[in-house]
């Protein structure tokens, strides 16, 4: 440890006490975005970090380079030296490392519990909602960084301007994505909460009851202290319905006339969104946002609302908006390539819920109106495909050409009628487009070689391993001869 690092740690310890009797922290599923972010912050705070995952990836390699001990595969001996074990949502009690920790009476905590511990002595800003969490977290982080406040942040995806999804800052500010998928965000006790929207998703967690999901968001907001602030999107009909039940200070944002922070005159020019933000008791801001789509204008308005309440200068806000590079796999431009059939633009996007796919399609249409939209879609989870089947069909038939990959199961068993072939048949029967089903991604290059044309926008869409597929296509530069050879 360098002298500078020791001095930095001493400064942090003056603000944030260390966890007593905790020396070594073990993460099961350390390669995931949410887990790795917390692990990286704790590693930089001086704790010994170990972790395990089923396979190596860029995240595990980066953590290993920073000094973490990463095991590939799960086995009981991995937790032998741990003071505490942190588990991701995907890890159950049958995991051999969890069983070994229980037998050795080593505390086992969920990811959100450890995040709550990081937040306990800091000024926490938590970003929740069904969609837009990762981008909003990144935008808040960028504003505070531009203002010289050096925040700690833990995000669910890569903050491209920082080159990482988490970083330990020198101030008391912690900006974090809050995960509602398993209701674990109820562990958090922030000073400021953003809620971007509320839709029916992860319903198995909530017993299939949307009212339970809504009440859980209310409970999350009521974790705020009485002087805390709830920043919520009034355009969302569910949030508008819930506002009277929120017993904390509420600040609203959106395109709606009655929003406290209001977006006006939105238009899109290619990759950039341009609009005016009107704020109460402050000058209006003319924003150039370096990521496309009305949905991202909403994400930006949420970040601007938080920054305005914290009295951050307009110069920092404007610089963050124009300077943002976005987040990994959120309408990520991977390049423009000469395919042999013509020039094609390749974009990768993580959206996997019908609402997310819909706003991505609209962003593509608005920014590149002259391009044919070719989508490679990989459904994520059979349960989501079943629950939102008609919504998926309605959204996906909007593209010009649809290539459908098999469902990315994410550990689920197949559900009859909720598979990609069925979804293709349903869309085909409506008569707008004729989807192409590709059972094996190895066949994808040849399929694309036969359908891509000059000027196409090729959009890889989904939350499974399609991001890896998109990068493989980019590595081949979408060249027809290269892809056929592959």
Swiss-Prot record:
Subcellular location: Cytoplasm
Sequence similarity: Belongs to the MurCDEF family.
Swiss-Prot/TrEMBL keywords: ATP-binding, Cell cycle, Cell division, Cell shape, Cell wall biogenesis/degradation, Cytoplasm, Ligase, Nucleotide-binding, Peptidoglycan synthesis
EC number: 6.3.2.8
Organism: Vibrio vulnificus (strain YJ016)
Stretches that traverse the bilayer: none
Gene3D superfamilies reported in the protein's UniProt record: Mur ligase, C-terminal domain, Mur-like, catalytic domain, NAD(P)-binding Rossmann-like Domain
Catalysed transformations (reactions): UDP-N-acetyl-alpha-D-muramate + L-alanine + ATP = UDP-N-acetyl-alpha-D-muramoyl-L-alanine + ADP + phosphate + H(+)
Protein name (database record): UDP-N-acetylmuramate--L-alanine ligase
GO molecular function, one term: ATP binding
GO CC aspect terms: cytoplasm
Function (record text): Cell wall formation.
Annotated residues for binding of ATP: 129-135
The keyword Cell cycle belongs to this UniProt entry's keyword annotation: yes
Matching PANTHER family: UDP-N-ACETYLMURAMATE--L-ALANINE LIGASE, UDP-N-ACETYLMURAMATE--L-ALANINE LIGASE-RELATED
Pathway(s) the chain acts in: Cell wall biogenesis; peptidoglycan biosynthesis
Biological processes per GO annotation: cell division; cell wall organization; peptidoglycan biosynthetic process; regulation of cell shape
Disulfide bonds: none
Cited InterPro entries: Mur-like_cat_sf (IPR036565), Mur_ligase_C (IPR004101), Mur_ligase_C_dom_sf (IPR036615), Mur_ligase_cen (IPR013221), Mur_ligase_N (IPR000713), MurCDEF_pg_biosynth (IPR050061), UDP-N-AcMur_Ala_ligase_MurC (IPR005758)
Keyword Metal-binding: no
């Amino acid at each position: 440890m360098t002298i500078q690092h020791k001095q930095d740690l001493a400064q942090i310890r003056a603000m944030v006490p260390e966890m007593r009797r905790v020396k070594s922290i073990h993460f099961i599923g350390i390669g995931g975005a949410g887990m790795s972010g917390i692990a990286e912050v704790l590693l930089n705070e001086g704790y010994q970090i170990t972790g395990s995952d089923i396979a190596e990836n860029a995240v595990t390699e980066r953590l290993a380079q920073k000094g973490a001990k990463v095991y590939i595969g799960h086995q009981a001996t991995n937790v032998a030296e741990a003071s505490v074990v942190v588990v991701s949502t995907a890890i159950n009690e049958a995991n051999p490392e969890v069983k070994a920790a229980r037998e050795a009476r080593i505390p086992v905590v969920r990811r959100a519990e450890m995040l709550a511990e990081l937040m306990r002595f800091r000024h926490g800003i938590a970003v929740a909602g069904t969609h837009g969490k990762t981008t909003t977290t990144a935008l808040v982080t960028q504003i505070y960084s531009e203002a010289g406040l050096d925040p700690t942040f833990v995000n669910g995806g890569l903050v491209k301007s920082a080159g990482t999804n988490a970083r330990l800052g020198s101030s008391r500010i912690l900006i974090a994505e809050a995960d509602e998928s398993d209701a674990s965000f109820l562990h958090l006790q922030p000073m400021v909460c953003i809620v971007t929207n509320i839709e029916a998703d992860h319903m198995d967690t909530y017993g299939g009851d949307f009212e339970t999901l809504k009440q859980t968001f209310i409970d999350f907001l009521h974790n705020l202290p009485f002087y805390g602030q709830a920043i919520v999107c009034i355009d969302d009909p569910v949030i508008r319905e819930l506002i009277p039940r929120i017993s904390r200070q509420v600040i609203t944002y959106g395109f709606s006339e009655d929003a406290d922070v209001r977006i006006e005159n939105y238009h899109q020019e290619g990759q950039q969104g341009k609009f005016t933000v009107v704020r109460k008791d402050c000058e209006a801001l003319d924003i150039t946002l370096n990521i496309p789509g009305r949905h991202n204008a909403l994400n930006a308005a949420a970040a601007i609302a938080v920054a305005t309440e914290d009295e951050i200068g307009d110069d920092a806000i404007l610089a963050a908006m124009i300077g943002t590079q976005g987040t990994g796999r959120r309408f990520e431009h991977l390049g423009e390539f000469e395919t042999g059939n013509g020039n094609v633009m390749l974009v990768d996007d993580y959206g996997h819920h019908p609402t997310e796919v819909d706003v991505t399609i609209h962003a593509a249409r608005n920014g590149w109106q002259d391009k044919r939209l070719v989508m490679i879609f990989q459904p994520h989870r059979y349960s989501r495909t079943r629950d939102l089947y008609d919504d998926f069909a309605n959204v996906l038939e909007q593209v010009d050409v649809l290539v459908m990959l098999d469902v990315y199961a994410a550990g689920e068993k197949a559900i009859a009628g909720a598979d990609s072939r069925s979804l293709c048949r349903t869309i085909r029967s409506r008569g707008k487009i004729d989807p192409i089903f590709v059972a094996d991604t190895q066949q994808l290059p040849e399929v694309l070689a036969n359908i891509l044309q000059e000027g196409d926008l090729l959009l890889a869409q989904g939350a499974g391993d399609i991001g890896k597929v998109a990068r493989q296509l980019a590595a081949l530069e979408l060249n027809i001869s290269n892809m056929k050879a592959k």
